[in-house]
Curated annotation (Swiss-Prot):
One of its GO terms (cellular component) is plasma membrane. This is Uncharacterized protein MJ1308. It comes from the Archaea. The chain crosses the membrane at residues 26-46, 54-74, 84-104. Its main location: membrane. It is found in: Cell membrane. It comes from Methanocaldococcus jannaschii (strain ATCC 43067 / DSM 2661 / JAL-1 / JCM 10045 / NBRC 100440) (Methanococcus jannaschii). Keywords: Cell membrane, Membrane, Transmembrane, Transmembrane helix. It is a multi-pass membrane protein.
Amino acid sequence: MVDFMDYNDFQKKLDKEEHGDGITVGAVYTGEFTLYLLFIFGALIIGRVYGKTLMTLFGLAALAFSLSVSPLIFKFKEENSNAINYQLFWLSIFLGAIAFCIYMTTRW
């Protein structure tokens, strides 16, 4: 028989065991590292293809900063890296931002 555990119960269990930084910090750092690596590779690819490297890097840096503070703006009550709706929401925001950058670099 499988025993399911609530997110809050699991967090309390981790707090009792003093297990590292907890799940929230690990999920945040993993997401940020993935996002910033995508920005770096995206900047290299877009800069190579369109030749507007400086403007592209500046735009991607601005997007990276705005996306890094967006969880502070929306104030999520708790973070669960298994919540697929949050992941799909931020993935769509990220892809839309990349598409906007490509559109802006091709216009100039």
